[in-house]
């Protein structure tokens, strides 16, 4: 399964927030056997989000869009995804009732905050999802996400994103296998070995240099477990290896 990750947020592009969501999702998807082909960050711009949602949905098996589901005026992701896929947004009654319940529970649990501040929560707007979407709701956050036409729309707050991803994680299981070994050998001294393993085995090999105190990482990925194991064994015979760092 080929997947694209689309991160939405002016704050990410400005460097105010680290894009930890994309890194976490890429690792989770790879471990499950999916292949992440693209990672892109775009601003909170409805037209731009719609364009990239449409392009990625046409090109890849699945798209995960994160961010822009809050209640502020710049949170336009859900509307943009609907635009990109050619859907109208409709009111989901069950989502609306769930949001009302969450709002009431928050006010009850935080009476001083509720009395001191005016919370302008547009529940009707937040409950409007693309027609034919499958709503995604967790207790970790307020906003609802959804799945529609292979596009997964998740919140940008990391804990909320992770909780919602776990609702759909099994849908990304694939047949990719990977193994990793560590070596103190400099990357520049392994050119022939890396070329050789690619020529002999139907695998992909990633070499990830580290700092002087951390060994380099070699990651072998393929679709056949035995082939990956054989490639790792071939590498172990030709490069110095060290235990996995703690």
Model features per residue range: what roles?
Residues 1-44:
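Glycine-rich phosphate/diphosphate-binding loop of Rossmann-like nucleotide-binding domains
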Residues 8-10, 65-73, 156, 221-223:
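Glycine-rich beta-strand-to-loop/alpha-helix junction loops that act as flexible
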Residues 14-17, 48, 73, 189, ...:
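Secondary-structure boundary/capping motif
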Residues 29, 66, 74-78:
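Short, conserved active-site loops that position catalytic residues or coordinate cofactors/metal ions
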Residues 34-41, 48-51, 63, 76-172:
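Proline/glycine-rich low-complexity loops and linkers
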Residues 47-65, 69:
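Glycine/small-residue-rich interface belts in oligomeric ring/scaffold proteins
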Residues 149-162, 166-238:
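An accessory alpha-helical subdomain
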Residues 238-246:
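Conserved short beta-strand edge segments in small beta-sheet-based binding/regulatory domains
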């Amino acid at each position: 399964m080929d997947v694209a990750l689309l991160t939405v947020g002016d704050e990410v592009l400005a460097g105010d927030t680290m894009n930890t969501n994309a890194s976490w999702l890429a690792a989770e998807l790879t471990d499950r056997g999916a292949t992440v082909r693209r990672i892109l960050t775009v601003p909170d711009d409805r037209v731009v989000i719609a364009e990239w949602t449409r392009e990625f949905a046409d090109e890849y098996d699945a798209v995960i869009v994160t961010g822009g589901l809050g209640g502020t005026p710049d949170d336009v992701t859900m509307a943009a995804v609907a635009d990109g896929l050619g859907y109208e947004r409709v009111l989901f009654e069950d989502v609306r009732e769930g949001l009302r319940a969450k709002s009431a529970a928050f006010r009850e649990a935080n009476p001083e905050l509720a009395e001191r501040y005016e919370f302008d929560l547009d529940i009707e707007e937040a409950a409007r999802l693309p027609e034919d979407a499958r709503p995604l709701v967790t207790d970790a956050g307020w906003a609802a996400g959804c799945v529609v036409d292979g596009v997964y729309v998740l919140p940008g707050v990391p804990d909320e994103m992770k909780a919602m991803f776990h609702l759909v994680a099994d849908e990304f299981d694939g047949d990719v296998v990977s193994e990793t070994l560590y070596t103190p050998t400099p990357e520049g001294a392994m050119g022939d070995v890396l070329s050789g393993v690619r020529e002999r085995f139907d695998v992909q090999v990633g070499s990830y240099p580290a700092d002087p105190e951390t060994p380099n990482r070699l990651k072998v990925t393929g679709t056949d477990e035995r082939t990956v194991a054989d490639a790792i064994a071939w590498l172990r015979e030709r490069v110095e290896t060290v235990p996995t760092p703690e």
